[in-house]
Structure formats: structure tokens, C-alpha cells
Regions:
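Short alpha-helix-to-loop micro-motif enriched in aromatics/charged/Gly
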Residues: 66-71
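Short phosphate-coordinating micro-motif centered on Lys-Gly-acidic
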Residues: 41-46
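Conserved beta-strand positions that form and line the central face of beta-propeller blades
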Residues: 34, 40, 72
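Cyclic-nucleotide recognition modules
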Residues: 74-123
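Cyclic nucleotide-binding regulatory module and flanking cytosolic helices
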Residues: 1-37, 81, 86-87
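Glycine- and acidic-residue-biased ligand/ion/polar-headgroup-sensing regions
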Residues: 38, 49-62, 78-79
């Protein structure tokens, strides 16, 4: 998993009600994660530290069945986000995220999002 600063994902798509100043704050606390096909973004049981927006590529969210098989519960495409429920619920991931193909994911620091919401509750 390779990280690089900034990215092509548009924060405006995630937070359309934000003023430019708030978008810059969020962008400053964000990075792009590049995943190869088959790589995990997060694993069931991990503690959430970020909210993720898919910029390019595609992820699947899977859970293990009682028989030990992986069951796809969601496919996350460009422009969609993942991890909000875990961040705001303050609990660990109950599923695993796997790149279906090479992907770029915008990682937004969870604390920065919480701070933004306290400043701009309309979001």
C-alpha cells in the first residue's frame, strides 16, 4: 500500500456544503492510498482512523460466513465513501475491504472530519 499526499478525488463531492476554507483544512489532513488488486484497505477488527473515498478503481467489502467463506456485502465505486459508520459509531470494522482492481483511495483523517463537523454542523 503506497501513500502519497493529496490526490485526484474531489472533496467537494463528499462535502458539497463546505466552504473552501473547510475543504482546504480537510485536504491538508488527507492523503491518497494506492492499492493493488487484492490488497486490503482495512481488515475486520481494525480500529478506524480515517474515512475513505474511492477516487479510481473499485473495492469490495466482505464478511466471513459461518462456513468460512467470503461474502461480498458491498461494492464501493469511484465517488463513494466507506468507513463513516465505524468512525462515528466509534467501533471496529466488522468487515474487510479488498481492492477488486488497482485503486486510489482518498484517506481523510477521522479527527479532522469530527473537528469540521463541530465547526460546521450543517455538513
Amino acid at each position: 500500500m503506497e501513500k502519497k499526499q493529496k490526490g485526484t478525488f474531489t472533496l467537494r463531492r463528499l462535502f458539497p456544503a463546505l466552504h473552501e476554507e473547510e475543504l482546504v483544512r480537510i485536504q491538508d489532513s488527507s492523503s491518497v492510498i494506492r492499492l493493488r488488486k487484492g490488497q486490503n484497505l482495512f481488515i475486520s477488527g481494525d480500529s478506524p482512523r480515517s474515512i475513505y473515498g474511492v477516487a479510481n478503481g473499485c473495492l469490495k467489502i466482505v464478511r466471513e460466513s459461518t462456513e468460512g467463506e467470503s461474502v461480498i456485502t458491498r461494492v464501493v465505486r469511484p465517488g463513494n465513501i466507506v468507513g463513516i459508520r465505524e468512525v462515528f459509531g466509534e467501533f471496529k470494522y466488522s468487515r474487510t475491504s479488498v481492492a477488486l482492481k488497482d485503486s486510489e483511495v482518498f484517506s481523510i483523517d477521522a479527527q479532522a472530519v469530527m473537528d469540521m463537523i463541530s465547526r460546521s454542523p450543517a455538513v
